[in-house]
Amino acid sequence: MDAAPMIHGTTVWPSPAKLNLFLYITGRRANGYHDLQTLFQFLDHGDELTITANNSGNITLSPALADVALEDNLIYKAAMALKNAAQSPLGADIQLHKVLPMGGGIGGGSSNAATTLVALNYLWQTGLSDDQLAEIGLALGADVPVFTRGFAAFAEGVGEELSAVEPEEKWYLVVRPAVSIATKDIFTHPQLMRNTPKRDLASLLTTPYENDCEKIVRSLYPEVDKQLSWLLQYAPSRLTGTGSCVFAEFSSRKDAQAVFAQLSDNVLAFVAQGRNVSPLRKTLADYQSAKIRPY
């Protein structure tokens, strides 16, 4: 029996952060899920996955994440989900270089899962479509499909109805207050506003951007409130997702860096530019065209 085809060698893949430039909660369904309207944009900053496909049939991941069992790790779950969906006999060694915080609202875990799906679909030559990868991703998390598709998007429904958009690619100063916030804790909070009127995209893009989770997060987490109040002195600033990260927007890298330089040394923060095409999609295209090659 012939060995399954695969791309040999070691490959390196970006796992970019995202921002919710706005986030509105327009209702709550009987199953507890929320109807949203949100605008996703990627950043040119994130984690990195080094992946080598092999014939072992096993998925190895290093380093192990503290307090997260391998079977619960989204990277492992994504690899196994693709393996099962494509009925692939292949395996992979995956190394994660982690810089994005967990519980930060910038998509760290969802982005890792999406990068795993996109990379292994290529390396294992499984040939699944973008729609199929998005469907697998949705079972892993509501934000995974936007990362697998790789385009800035306006999302509706529970976040799965995506329309490609091209917001301005501004510069952002992203600050991580010293607290991790579980999405579930915010979406189940009794004081969360859930009745924002649904609007069309044109209206949303021409009104000041807001985040319906921001008020409750600021009241529950003084660290977030303090950091956001500080940023608002310098530029339009908001919470992303359910936090804990907050961001300020600027028209130039120079302006963002100037405010970054004023932060205390013990504050976790970075400056990045918005990207309407994900660095992941660009890397995939570069591998497919042999612009970059495995080593």
Curated annotation (Swiss-Prot):
Where on this chain does ATP bind? 101-111
Show the GO MF annotations.
4-(cytidine 5'-diphospho)-2-C-methyl-D-erythritol kinase activity; ATP binding
What reaction gets catalysed by this protein?
4-CDP-2-C-methyl-D-erythritol + ATP = 4-CDP-2-C-methyl-D-erythritol 2-phosphate + ADP + H(+)
Pathway(s): Isoprenoid biosynthesis; isopentenyl diphosphate biosynthesis via DXP pathway; isopentenyl diphosphate from 1-deoxy-D-xylulose 5-phosphate: step 3/6
What is the E.C. number?
Answer: 2.7.1.148
> Does the record's keyword annotation contain Translocase?
no
Q: Which UniProt keywords apply?
A: ATP-binding, Isoprene biosynthesis, Kinase, Nucleotide-binding, Transferase
Nucleotide-binding is among the record's keywords? yes
Please list the residues that make up the active site: 18, 143
Q: Which terms under GO biological process does the entry name?
A: isopentenyl diphosphate biosynthetic process, methylerythritol 4-phosphate pathway; terpenoid biosynthetic process
Enzyme class (EC, first level) = transferase
Xref: InterPro entries = GHMP_kinase_C_dom, GHMP_kinase_C_sf, GHMP_kinase_N_dom, IspE, Ribosomal_Su5_D2-typ_SF, Ribsml_uS5_D2-typ_fold_subgr
Described function: Catalyzes the phosphorylation of the position 2 hydroxy group of 4-diphosphocytidyl-2C-methyl-D-erythritol.
Q: Which family does it belong to?
A: Belongs to the GHMP kinase family. IspE subfamily.
Q: What is this protein called?
A: 4-diphosphocytidyl-2-C-methyl-D-erythritol kinase
